[in-house]
Amino acid sequence: MPRVKGGTVTRKRRKKVLKLAKGYFGSKHTLYKVANQQVMKSGNYAFRDRRQKKRDFRKLWITRINAAARMNGLSYSRLMHGLKLSGIEVNRKMLADLAVNDLTAFNQLADAAKAQLNK
């Protein structure tokens, strides 16, 4: 039985890895072994950071809401509790956007939360 070298399959696999490694620095975009290691590491980073991004944005939104809430004399937690009591269902992303781009609308929401907390 003759030996099968598998040249086209191997070349295709290596070409695919080197294509993914395009733009990497130094030998990481030319040498297959190093490129393969870096592509696998990059995939791990991408997987991890897709989840991390959600946490980072939530932290950013909370920080922005807290800053705007404190300008209205409320803490973040008191503002959120007041909004929940008054039945206003606005998510953190929308609240943070209001805090940055439309402060008057945010102030109205904060006043509604304050009124509900003072009842």
Swiss-Prot record:
Keyword line: Ribonucleoprotein, Ribosomal protein, RNA-binding, rRNA-binding
InterPro entries assigned to the protein according to its UniProt record, in alphabetical order: Ribosomal_bL20 (IPR005813), RIBOSOMAL_L20_CS (IPR049946), Ribosomal_protein_bL20_C (IPR035566)
Keyword RNA-binding in record: yes
Cellular component terms per the entry's GO annotation: cytosolic large ribosomal subunit
GO molecular function list: rRNA binding; structural constituent of ribosome
Gene Ontology BP terms: ribosomal large subunit assembly; translation
Function: Binds directly to 23S ribosomal RNA and is necessary for the in vitro assembly process of the 50S ribosomal subunit. It is not involved in the protein synthesizing functions of that subunit.
NCBIfam families noted in UniProt: rplT_bact
Quaternary data: Part of the 50S ribosomal subunit.
Family membership noted in the UniProt record: Belongs to the bacterial ribosomal protein bL20 family.
Name under which the protein is recorded: Large ribosomal subunit protein bL20
Organism, scientific name: Bacillus subtilis (strain 168)
Organism placement in taxonomy: Bacteria, Bacillati, Bacillota, Bacilli, Bacillales
